[in-house]
């Protein structure tokens, strides 16, 4: 498992001990911005290898300027373009599913978050479709 874009004023290494002890790769927002979305995608690819993958996208990984309608807005997140490019660069992995979580319509100023969520869902559907086309047909034996 890879967690990308972890941040927050209280996000210290101690807070992520469960993730580390469970073998998860945590890529902080600082590391993401220092090394870039291509590097983060490559890290995820290394960990996933040829295995099946599931992509869960938490809308609050985005900066609240792009997605204010979430329960835990935290400045300093990804831009919409960074998220799109990251997801696109993960194309070719054997995705078996995906989801988008943490959209909170009552907090959504002017429909910004729902429009952004729809854009991210479109990107997720594209990589899911690509994975399905690339997957070998199931044997009916």
Model-derived features: positions:
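Long hydrophobic alpha-helical segments that form multi-pass transmembrane helix bundles
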Residues: 1, 15-16
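Catalytic cores of soluble, metal-dependent hydrolases
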Residues: 10, 16-141
């Amino acid at each position: 498992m890879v967690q990308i874009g972890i941040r927050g004023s209280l996000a210290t290494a101690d807070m992520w001990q469960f993730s580390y002890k469970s073998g998860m790769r945590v890529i902080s927002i600082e590391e993401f911005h220092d090394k870039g979305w291509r590097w983060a995608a490559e890290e995820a690819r290394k960990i996933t290898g040829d295995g099946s993958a599931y992509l869960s996208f938490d809308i609050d990984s985005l900066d609240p300027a792009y997605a204010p309608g979430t329960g835990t807005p935290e400045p300093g997140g990804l831009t919409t373009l960074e998220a799109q490019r990251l997801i696109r660069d993960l194309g070719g992995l054997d995705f078996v599913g995906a989801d988008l979580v943490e959209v909170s319509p009552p907090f959504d100023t002017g429909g910004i978050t729902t429009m952004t969520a729809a854009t991210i869902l479109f990107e997720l559907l594209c990589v899911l479709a690509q994975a399905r086309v690339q997957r070998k047909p199931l044997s009916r034996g």
